[in-house]
Design a protein with these regions (language model features):
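Extended, highly charged
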Residues: 1-302, 306-488
């Protein structure tokens, strides 16, 4: 079934066929904090403050102020759903993405009238207003404004003509203005905007919203796995076995995802910076993946919007920042990156990788490692160091043996309790640049931290020493199929 998924609507149709994976409501909802507040209880999960849980995706059919639009949330807020949408098993997702990176299928131009341009609104229209055209929610009452959390930003380098797709923090700032936040030195489109600014040029950009989940997952790869010049839309093409189709924008010299629900066209303005919370003055941006509300930036870049195009009766897609949806989008590409790097260095040892919900998909990874010979003792720790190299934002790595389910944190903690000694099996790497959104990465937290964003990376080696394996066999139960006893 999943091979038929090519856009948001076919993805939702697939989930509709699966028990307990999609619910719809006709009760009107306010996109300002209420919508996210509802879904927090229904299925956000992740690092969201409890009570929350993993639950179904949800469609709100009646959104206050937007009579012709729906809002979908939580599509990727379950590893099981992501696997179904990509036609694989949950435990195979990282390896599948790793293969897709190695066998990319580049995007192609769409022929004909693009679905995303069925309705066109130009910024020159007298009644043009982003607030009315795009039902972007706020997650909490403290948010700087309405946020587009699942916008696929697509741009072209002004010198090299290479393309890139990335998800960025986008806040509606006015009727025809968006702010965009670039993590300093970490994102390709940020580098493109900086180069365009050096040249005194505007950077054309398209923002596609409501697309094939394969695009959303693929767009979250980062260097070194996908260096500058690698178009992550090629990963989505490989996942689907066919290229992503792009159409020419209506008002700027750029392309957009042809079957998106919405496309926002515009230009990143050189020399222009805006205060992210200039309209709310709350001091906050929005809830971020670590589970805290991030501070508003006073140096966001400015996008001058030139058009909004969309399908007829469009579906806005959104996510809650700290939800399980972010864990899926950030974590699974990280798993693929770690697996690919370690497999090249020491083939056959790394069995699997899981980037846990507790780390928001970025801060924590569990590596399932198989020691094949006495000389493999110590290689598990080398694998952890490679993981830190593959993904700089990673903070903690847990190492477990092949008989431990790396996707079950209770099993991981069991290994920690029975195969780990704190004075022997903790390896720390202090003073390493990590992720700026971790509030403990700050000199105020510890005098050993020289600058905000620097952390102590830690390895927890919960593997059995190779020469002691015979003493750590788990209880062996009878292997059988229990279905005979479960039939009614």
């Amino acid at each position: 079934m999943a091979e038929k998924v090519r856009d948001l609507r076919s993805a939702l149709a697939l989930l509709e066929q699966m028990p307990d994976q999609l619910i719809e409501t006709d009760v009107e909802v306010d996109p300002m904090a209420e919508l996210a507040g509802v879904y927090r209880y229904v299925g956000a999960g992740g690092t969201v403050k409890r009570p929350t849980k993993e639950g179904p995706a949800m469609i709100f059919n009646h959104v206050k102020g937007h009579p012709d639009a729906k809002v979908a949330i939580g599509l990727l807020a379950s590893r099981k759903r992501v696997a179904a949408l990509l036609d694989t098993k949950p435990e195979n997702l990282g390896k599948m993405l790793c293969k897709s990176v190695e066998n990319p299928i580049p995007p192609v131009d769409f022929e004909g009238d693009a679905p995303c341009q069925q309705v066109v609104h130009k910024a020159t229209d007298q009644d043009f207003d982003l607030y009315k055209l795009v039902p972007a929610p706020t997650n909490t009452p403290d948010d700087a404004g309405p946020y587009i959390t699942l916008g696929m930003c697509y741009a072209t380098h002004p010198d090299t003509e290479v393309h890139d797709v990335t998800i960025h923090r986008l806040c509606i700032q006015g009727k025809d203005e968006l702010s965009i936040f670039f993590t300093p030195g970490a994102r390709h489109i940020g580098a493109m905007a900086e180069r365009a600014e050096e040249l005194g040029q505007k950077l054309p950009i398209s923002i596609s919203i409501g697309v094939d989940p394969a695009i959303e997952i693929g767009s979250c790869f980062e260097p070194p796995t996908t260096p500058l010049g690698y178009d992550e839309l090629s990963v989505a093409g490989a996942l689907r076995g066919e290229p992503v189709e792009l159409c020419k924008c209506v008002t700027v010299n750029e392309r957009a995802i042809a079957n998106a629900e919405y496309v926002i066209e515009g230009e990143v303005i050189p020399g222009a910076r805006v205060k992210e919370d200039q309209n709310s003055n709350t001091g906050y941006a929005m809830p971020e993946f670590p589970g805290y509300t991030g501070p508003a930036s006073d140096q966001c870049w400015l996008i001058k919007v030139t058009a909004v195009t969309h399908r007829e009766h469009p579906i806005m897609q959104t996510c809650i920042g700290p939800s399980e949806e972010h864990v899926s989008m950030a974590g699974i590409p990280t798993e693929a990156s770690i697996y690919g790097m370690v497999e090249k260095a020491m083939p056959g040892r790394l069995q699997n990788v899981y980037c846990s919900s507790a780390g928001g998909g970025k801060y924590m990874a569990v590596l399932q490692f198989k020691k094949l010979s006495p000389s493999d003792e110590g290689r598990q720790r080398q694998a952890a160091l490679l993981a830190f190299s593959a993904f700089s934002e990673l903070k903690n790595v847990f190492l477990v043996d092949e008989d431990v389910d790396c996707f079950d944190m209770n099993d991981v903690l069991w290994a920690m309790n029975t195969r780990f000694q704190g004075d022997e099996d903790v390896i720390t790497v202090p003073g390493v640049r990590c992720h700026p959104l971790d509030p403990s990465n700050d000199p105020a937290f510890s005098p050993s931290i020289r600058d905000h964003g620097i952390a102590c990376k830690t390895i927890f080696d919960c593997t059995v020493p190779y020469d002691l394996k015979d003493r750590f066999h788990r209880a062996r139960f009878m292997e059988l199929d229990p279905e005979k006893w479960l039939k009614k």
